[in-house]
Every structure is written in structure tokens, then in C-alpha cells.
């Protein structure tokens, strides 16, 4: 019997890319490929790249070069680029980076197995010429669902399989194959974006906004629960737009309670919310539905009106603070995170001071700060009044220092509070990191963790109530409560 073909998936970038990698993994495994964790053990190393900002693109190139270094002295025979940077640059990337044996776009995903086999056999796959993927779907959202059947939409599940391939209880295989044993998994709610932020190129390569049907999201969530997942995080470029192409802009409000009722799911988290599209009903559902985390990942980006207008965005400091007041009037301990761009073209000292005023009053749990840099193909790249790089760097350092101080202060405010923690890692020796998890106000990777002072009887995937007794920067230190049903049940075994 011939030795099985092996493939490793290396994922960079956001949670949406993680979903796409698991779809690719499912397709490859269904076609006989053996998935391995270490690229050194793979015939083909597939690097799922990020093309968001310059630093992310550099990381993607570095990962491709690192994988290429494995060729010639191990099992690895080919390195293939997929993902956003591959889609965005296509042939340009292939010409600039001959170390990659193939550059595959989203349209290649349905045939990923054949593409990799061709490359592994020494064949050449001609990289695509990039196109604006917004033009693949109708301008009218109401017409997109029908047209979407003919468009590659990574993470939406395959549309190229015959009916009846998989049981009705779950998504049609091969939808995805989990690449780790984490009790947390992202679920793609939609793809693309209809907003026209002047600094962002994502819509050009991810396309116009298109929702997944609620039944598909529910089926995938049930399947994930069967795999041991306890928390799902809904991801897309803009979750607040969910349902607008399905005839119901409030569809998220009705979907969330249904997701929370899926057997085995203990927490539902929503990410990527646009402040300008927040509505009272959505705030109500996010703050009052059992098992739905009162968590708000709000994309503020700035708070000075002049800068926001130049960004083609809406709002100001006072309106954003009013939104936060509304949220906290319903859920005082709600978690809030956001990202900000400093050094945007035309940003004055007064604009920066206005952003700092907002940050000082907002009491955010997590803050990401980025220095502006031109992204080709964006409106902002054509702007005059650009700031010198050293000015951008100074402002980035200044606001980053403030952000670090503020999120530490916000963590201190939670001392004495009771938090519900999903256990994500347990050191069996009781040393090192001990038992770590996340509370409702903490999303994976970005928002800090909770270190539990006692781990007796706790295991990965358990929920436990704990009292916050201290902090380590943005992280919390908490003591499990003896009365927590899950802790007591597990500890007594």
C-alpha cells in the first residue's frame, strides 16, 4: 500500500482564517491526505496567509520562507500559499516569491486536493490574476444569496457536493476538520463587507457582504458541540450586518438564543461589531440572553470627528461614550474591546488628544493600537497631508503606553467580582501556568486570561465560577468558588 500523502496547515492572521484552514483540512482529509501538525513531517506545507496590513504580510512571507527552508533535508517537498495575501496578490506574489511552489486563490479551494497533488508531482499551477471580488456578487443584497452559489466563499461550507453526502444532523462533509482540541471554535457568520472605509482593502479581496443561512450556522455549531467545543465565537468582517441579504437585518437577534440552546454549548460570543450599526434590540439580546456573552468587540478606530470622516466612518467621542453607557446600563460588567489607528493622514495633535480623551473615559477591557501605513488600492493611500513615519511611530508608542495603563486599570476594577471561567489549559504537574481560562469579557488570543489559584478537579472545557482576587496586567487572578456546580461535580469525582 503506498504511503499516504501528508500535509500541514500553517495558519496566520485572524479567526476567520482559522475557519478557512479547517475547511481546507476537511477537504484534504476527505480526499485521503493525512494531516500533520509539524511542517517538517509534511509532503506539502500549506501556509494560510494574512494580507491585512504590512506587518501581517511580512509575517506571511517569513512563514513561507521558513517552510521553504525545510525542503531538501526532510520530508517537505512543496510549499503552497493560500489565504488573503495569496488571493490579493496572486501572480504578483508568485513572481516575487519563487520559494512558494504554488499560490492558490479562493477559487482553488474546492479543488485543493488536486491542486496540491499537481504541485507535488512537479506540475505548475498558474497563479491567478487578482480581481475585485466585490464585482462577483450583485450590488443589491437581496440578490446575493442566489448568486453566491456560484462564488467561492471560504468558510461557508461547500456548495460543490451532491445532496445527501452527509447526515441531516450536521453540515455537509467535508465542511471542516478541527486542527486542535481547544474547547473554543470560531464559526463564520458571513463573508465580505459593504463598508468603504478609506484605509481598508479587505472588501476588494474578500468581496461584498453575504450571510450564511441560520440553519447552516446552527448545524455547524451542533457539529462543533459534538467535537467537544464549549464556546463558539461568531466571526465575519461585520456581524452587525448579518441577515441584511436574507431579508431581516435583525436576524442575529433571533439566531443568538437558538445557538445558546445547542446541547453542549456553554457560551456564545459575537465579534466584529460596527458601532454605527448597533441597535437597541441587539444590545438587549447580547446583555440578557443566557449563555450569550455580554461582550462587545466594537470597531471604533478613532474618536475625533475629522479623522473618522476621512476614514469614511461615523461617530465621535460623545456618541461612542453614550453607546458604552447604554451597554453598561444593561450589563455593568460587560466586556468591551476595540482597535484604533493613530497617525492617519491629517490627524492633528488636537485629534490625537480627542482620542486620548475617549480612551480615558471608555474603560475598555482590551485595546489594540496600530500606526497608520498606506495600503495599496485604498482611498487613504491617495490622501495628501501624510504624517512623517517618525511622527506616526511616536504617536503609536504614546497611545500604546496609555492603552496598556488603562486596560490594567480596568482589570483592577474587576477585583472582587465573580467571573465565569472556561478552562482552556491545565498544567498536570500543577506548575508553570497552572490552570488558565477566560471569562465572559475575554475573547481568545486578544483580551487576556484568568489564572485560577486552584485547579483541583478541573479539566479543559469545564466552566467554573471564580472570585477575582488580583491582576497581572490585563490578566486576572481568581479563586474558584466552592459552590460552583461544575467545579464541585468535577472535584468530587
Curated annotation (Swiss-Prot):
<dbReference type="GO" id="GO:0005829">
    <property type="term" value="C:cytosol"/>
</dbReference>
<keyword id="KW-0411">Iron-sulfur</keyword>
<feature type="domain" description="TRAM">
    <location>
        <begin position="412"/>
        <end position="482"/>
    </location>
</feature>
<dbReference type="InterPro" id="IPR005839">
    <property type="entry name" value="Methylthiotransferase"/>
</dbReference>
<dbReference type="Pfam" id="PF18693">
    <property type="entry name" value="TRAM_2"/>
</dbReference>
<feature type="domain" description="MTTase N-terminal">
    <location>
        <begin position="5"/>
        <end position="121"/>
    </location>
</feature>
<feature type="binding site">
    <location>
        <position position="50"/>
    </location>
    <ligand>
        <name>[4Fe-4S] cluster 1</name>
    </ligand>
</feature>
<keyword id="KW-0408">Iron</keyword>
<feature type="region of interest" description="Disordered">
    <location>
        <begin position="153"/>
        <end position="177"/>
    </location>
</feature>
<dbReference type="GO" id="GO:0051539">
    <property type="term" value="F:4 iron, 4 sulfur cluster binding"/>
</dbReference>
<dbReference type="Pfam" id="PF00919">
    <property type="entry name" value="UPF0004"/>
</dbReference>
<feature type="binding site">
    <location>
        <position position="200"/>
    </location>
    <ligand>
        <name>[4Fe-4S] cluster 2</name>
    </ligand>
</feature>
<keyword id="KW-0963">Cytoplasm</keyword>
<dbReference type="InterPro" id="IPR013848">
    <property type="entry name" value="Methylthiotransferase_N"/>
</dbReference>
<dbReference type="InterPro" id="IPR002792">
    <property type="entry name" value="TRAM_dom"/>
</dbReference>
<dbReference type="GO" id="GO:0006400">
    <property type="term" value="P:tRNA modification"/>
</dbReference>
<dbReference type="InterPro" id="IPR023404">
    <property type="entry name" value="rSAM_horseshoe"/>
</dbReference>
<feature type="binding site">
    <location>
        <position position="197"/>
    </location>
    <ligand>
        <name>[4Fe-4S] cluster 2</name>
    </ligand>
</feature>
<dbReference type="Pfam" id="PF04055">
    <property type="entry name" value="Radical_SAM"/>
</dbReference>
<comment type="function">
    <text>Catalyzes the methylthiolation of an aspartic acid residue of ribosomal protein uS12.</text>
</comment>
<dbReference type="InterPro" id="IPR005840">
    <property type="entry name" value="Ribosomal_uS12_MeSTrfase_RimO"/>
</dbReference>
<feature type="binding site">
    <location>
        <position position="84"/>
    </location>
    <ligand>
        <name>[4Fe-4S] cluster 1</name>
    </ligand>
</feature>
<feature type="domain" description="Radical SAM core">
    <location>
        <begin position="179"/>
        <end position="410"/>
    </location>
</feature>
<keyword id="KW-0949">S-adenosyl-L-methionine</keyword>
<comment type="similarity">
    <text>Belongs to the methylthiotransferase family. RimO subfamily.</text>
</comment>
<protein>
    <recommendedName>
        <fullName>Ribosomal protein uS12 methylthiotransferase RimO</fullName>
        <ecNumber>2.8.4.4</ecNumber>
    </recommendedName>
</protein>
<feature type="binding site">
    <location>
        <position position="193"/>
    </location>
    <ligand>
        <name>[4Fe-4S] cluster 2</name>
    </ligand>
</feature>
<feature type="binding site">
    <location>
        <position position="14"/>
    </location>
    <ligand>
        <name>[4Fe-4S] cluster 1</name>
    </ligand>
</feature>
<keyword id="KW-0004">4Fe-4S</keyword>
<dbReference type="InterPro" id="IPR038135">
    <property type="entry name" value="Methylthiotransferase_N_sf"/>
</dbReference>
<dbReference type="InterPro" id="IPR007197">
    <property type="entry name" value="rSAM"/>
</dbReference>
<dbReference type="GO" id="GO:0103039">
    <property type="term" value="F:protein methylthiotransferase activity"/>
</dbReference>
<dbReference type="InterPro" id="IPR020612">
    <property type="entry name" value="Methylthiotransferase_CS"/>
</dbReference>
<dbReference type="GO" id="GO:0035599">
    <property type="term" value="F:aspartic acid methylthiotransferase activity"/>
</dbReference>
<keyword id="KW-0479">Metal-binding</keyword>
<dbReference type="GO" id="GO:0046872">
    <property type="term" value="F:metal ion binding"/>
</dbReference>
<dbReference type="InterPro" id="IPR012340">
    <property type="entry name" value="NA-bd_OB-fold"/>
</dbReference>
<keyword id="KW-0808">Transferase</keyword>
<dbReference type="InterPro" id="IPR006638">
    <property type="entry name" value="Elp3/MiaA/NifB-like_rSAM"/>
</dbReference>
